[in-house]
């Protein structure tokens, strides 16, 4: 054992032992309780960031603690390796996405290994490899057979210059991110999955999940189950009688309709725009906008009157039809009723274009004005219908029932349950993804690839150039034979949404070498006992993975219908930001490591200068670490300088896992100092700690009893904190332990050995390298086996017993001191001790005790 703690040497030695022992390979064992903990697999972007370090350390701590408690634990890892960033990098560097991806995986895997993570690498999954995505294709075909997958036209963003489809995030202010061309909306055939078929189950099953309430609420709102009325506004056009259908959750406001708005893609819009260039120009403008719902929510609401009217379904009055840029064809019926008096968006639209505003809901005693928006119908319990003819005076529920009944009687509508959730469009007009296993035959149409011909292998040697899909230009991939008729045919060139890849990888971890999609091992490990990832995945990834599990269950592949029992969404890692702004308003961001900050006498930052030129920079505040703000910390530099254990200790100590973590260089230094203290104590006391001698706890000297009482008391709290995932207080407990052990005077070697051994085991899940090496160097491994498999220390309840207890002493309700009494002291003895105490005499000032209040085990209050 070396006197000096050298993290690089310690960590290399520990990792060498773990590799030699194949320490983290997990096997199924029906006789042991399993614990399957998974961190959301990373995208291989090139390097780990501190968010990764925090996530994986949380997972690792959980794994090690539960393994010490006898669980059969598994912590796997893989790579979410398909996706657009690889294509962008390929275009920038002139290399195939495959090369860029595999190089990044190799580097990031090396980084993970340097962290000492308890990963079973024999289960590694890489989603861009054919042995994985074969099963994406296989399940897609099964879903196609069952009608869970289907084909229809869908709207996409089309860049007319680059001749390619753009993701929503690639459309910036209505233009393509590379070409700058005005983006168009296009309707193209795409494949969808019927997630809506599972909407109620996805909603109801949320109640049984141990997930953060925030995530459950987000999914609940995304699914968006609504109870309302679907009805139509009658109209006649080209000699045909039709209905302009809408859905509303507020049928009680129908009498307040003053206009209808339809989407630019609505069939009625195209018909009304014939021979109307201005109307067609507005439709074209709408189609150039993004197709994301978020874009619609934030964009300026604009519309154009069509000059056409439909009839109000209850009054027969004409209702003007507008085309609105805020109406989505993909939601509802592609048309909405405009009730400006009782809908804020409609109110703004009506004020902008001078449309009538008709109040039809009121609360008695309240005054209404059309000058500014008011929540006129927010109070459903007190509001009643007004200006609504025979419905006047009806409350919300009664009005909805009556109006729905009249619409139904007239054949115009009825009550309906709808969902905000839409079917999952999985087609992507991109190269770097799972090929959709469909062949297009001139004679047979769309033909599924036969199961025996799977996987349809994606060529890995193509380099995208930004002009269309490389697969469409690859004869070797594109040209094939129809499996039905044998004629020349073409492969589908769309690939699958990368959310397909991440929808089930955790099931493949359980059986990575299976010759089927999954096998019996999957039902042993799944569902995950703990899933860990960022809140940003609350909706899409987590919702799709829940859907995928239910589909796999219904196909008889697995026994479970939910992929994760428990979910932890770790907080973001934050750091200071610094910038300079030029005359044009452009900001240049500087890394905190390149800046010197000055503070006032209260420790608040008051200024900063750039180290390289000594000139001031602006303080931008604390924000999430990101490339855009240049405020990240390179984990590899941290590990190289301080060691992985210091990085792990800081990230666990700085904040509870679910809360945001503010980066602190001083905190990292503090973590490093603490580990040096742990090592230094072990080295300085190595001879005493090597003493293996039994002891009779009851016969120990008071100093030994005091030390054991403190250590076992802190151990009890640390055990509780590990179970509730409060790792920051676990580290605090370990620090208390070290303080107690260092401060113990006259302790016998055997007691010192016991208590230091408890400290090493409490710290081990957080800092496995240094504790593993100390455990071995000080002979604990010879006695108990390697720390990898050492059992969690048991609390000695007898050690917590005290002959004396300390009570708070109060005089007239104010704390005046402390009173030590025998643990089993009678009330009379406590009262006598209180009035005899010197602090009572001092503050009573000669006055006798009138009343003595004793709260057992806590305090004694003497009233004078």
UniProtKB/Swiss-Prot annotation:
One of its GO terms (biological process) is leucyl-tRNA aminoacylation. Keywords: Aminoacyl-tRNA synthetase, ATP-binding, Cytoplasm, Ligase, Nucleotide-binding, Protein biosynthesis. One of its GO terms (molecular function) is leucine-tRNA ligase activity. Pfam families: Anticodon_1, tRNA-synt_1, tRNA-synt_1_2, tRNA-synt_1g. ATP binds at residue 627. One of its GO terms (cellular component) is cytosol. It is found in: Cytoplasm. InterPro entries: aa-tRNA-synth_I_CS, aa-tRNA-synth_Ia, Leu-tRNA-ligase, Leu_tRNA-synth_edit, M/V/L/I-tRNA-synth_anticd-bd, Methionyl/Leucyl_tRNA_Synth, Rossmann-like_a/b/a_fold, tRNAsynth_Ia_anticodon-bd. Its EC number is 6.1.1.4. The keyword ATP-binding applies. A motif ('KMSKS' region) lies at residues 624-628. A motif ('HIGH' region) lies at residues 42-52. SUPFAM superfamilies: Anticodon-binding domain of a subclass of class I aminoacyl-tRNA synthetases, Nucleotidylyl transferase, ValRS/IleRS/LeuRS editing domain. It comes from the Bacteria. It catalyses: tRNA(Leu) + L-leucine + ATP = L-leucyl-tRNA(Leu) + AMP + diphosphate. Belongs to the class-I aminoacyl-tRNA synthetase family. This is Leucine--tRNA ligase. The lineage of its organism: Bacteria, Pseudomonadati, Pseudomonadota, Betaproteobacteria, Burkholderiales.
